[in-house]
């Protein structure tokens, strides 16, 4: 048996429940004209004739309505506009990822500065940053040291970030989440 690695992605563009011209199988429709005006309830043959006279398509846009709603429109143009809108929406979407920076309660100044520099890079790129401190062994009894380190980290990034989630404990780990400041863009 032969299987191909290449799969063709089939996109249904603007054809969710739309029936066009000869695909429409109802007797009468509530007709909407080219400019969006109501033309009333018409037999399908008359609606099709009106669409043919205007050199456009008759498209059934709401088949579940009583009577079904059909619109006289240029389907090719409608499909093009729909694709254009979808493309614009995809461009406007921004994927926000959460990057993690791990610290220890007894972190040294040099290491702290390196982690801080990395977090600043993430924030400048528009990513959120989760700053976590893992307590090992008996360090769990000194949570205030971890809270102090997180407070220093938040203070050092306050010019480009806002605290989205305050420092809190989760098991043997204390964390807070920073988000890029929106007004600084």
UniProtKB/Swiss-Prot annotation:
GO cellular component: cytosol; membrane
MF terms in GO: ribosome binding; translation initiation factor activity
UniProt-annotated location(s): Cytoplasm
Predominant subcellular localization, coarse grouping: cytoplasm
Segments crossing the lipid bilayer: none
Gene3D superfamilies: Translation initiation factor 3 (IF-3), C-terminal domain, Translation initiation factor 3 (IF-3), N-terminal domain
Keywords annotated in UniProt: Cytoplasm, Initiation factor, Protein biosynthesis
Entry's Gene Ontology BP terms: ribosome disassembly
Stated role: IF-3 binds to the 30S ribosomal subunit and shifts the equilibrium between 70S ribosomes and their 50S and 30S subunits in favor of the free subunits, thus enhancing the availability of 30S subunits on which protein synthesis initiation begins.
Family label: Belongs to the IF-3 family.
HAMAP family with a match to the protein in the record: IF_3
Subunit: Monomer.
Record-given protein name: Translation initiation factor IF-3
């Amino acid at each position: 048996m032969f299987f191909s690695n290449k799969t063709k992605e089939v996109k249904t563009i603007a054809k969710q429940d739309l029936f066009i011209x000869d695909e429409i199988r109802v007797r009468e429709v509530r007709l909407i004209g080219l400019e969006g005006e109501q033309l009333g309830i018409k037999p399908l043959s008359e609606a099709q004739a009106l669409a043919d006279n205007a050199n456009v398509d008759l498209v059934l846009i709401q088949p579940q309505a009583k009577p079904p709603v059909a619109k006289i429109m240029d389907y090719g143009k409608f499909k093009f506009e729909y694709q254009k809108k979808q493309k614009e929406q995809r461009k406007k979407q921004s994927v926000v990822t959460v990057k993690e920076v791990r610290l220890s309660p007894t972190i040294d100044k040099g290491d702290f500065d390196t982690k801080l520099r990395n977090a600043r890079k993430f924030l400048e790129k528009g990513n959120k940053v989760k700053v976590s401190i893992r307590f090992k062994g008996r360090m769990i009894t000194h949570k205030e040291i971890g809270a102090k380190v997180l407070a220093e980290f938040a203070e050092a990034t306050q010019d480009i970030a806002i605290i989205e989630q305050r420092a809190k404990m989760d098991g043997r780990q204390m964390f807070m989440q920073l988000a890029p400041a929106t007004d600084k863009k």
